[in-house]
Amino acid sequence: MASIKLDGAGASKMKTLEEALVSLQTIHGIVERMAMDVQNKKGVGVIPMQLKRIAAPLVGQLKGQFGMIADQISTMLLVAGRGGGDQVKVRAYREHVAQVRTAMETAQKKVTRDHGVEIELAPE
């Protein structure tokens, strides 16, 4: 029976993606909290600043190996600086989070395909 193991470069890329997914989950939680505040007609307060504070290091983390995903996150940060209503911002944040998550999942599959090495497992 064969199994797939990642080579060194693949393991490094996969570790970067897994850490980035944890940060993205945090961002998603903040966006949903912002959506609840907007729905309840409360002010969003410092939530856009929290998003910037979490997403900016994520851009730096991904820039070296996954530049296109980092660019998508940078675009998401630009949404925070634009004018417009909070509902429009929430919608844009949700769309960007979904795009980034899809891009990360696609990148994980690509890393597995490109850096996967088949190993033979011993029979039981």
Name each model-derived stretch.
Residues 18-25, 45, 49, 67-71:
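Alpha-helix N-cap/helix-start motif at coil-to-helix transitions, marked by capping-box chemistry
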Residues 1-34, 86-124:
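Amphipathic, coiled-coil-like alpha-helical segments
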Residues 32-54:
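Alpha-helical segments in soluble extracytoplasmic regions
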Residues 73-85, 102-105:
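Long amphipathic alpha-helical coiled-coil segments
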Residues 37-40, 65-68, 72-75, 113-117:
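Charged, alpha-helical coiled-coil and linker scaffolds that mediate dimerization/oligomerization
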Residues 38-46, 61-68, 84-91:
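Short acidic, glycine/proline-enriched loop segments that cap or flank alpha-helices
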Residues 50, 61-79, 91-96:
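Short, well-ordered alpha-helical segments
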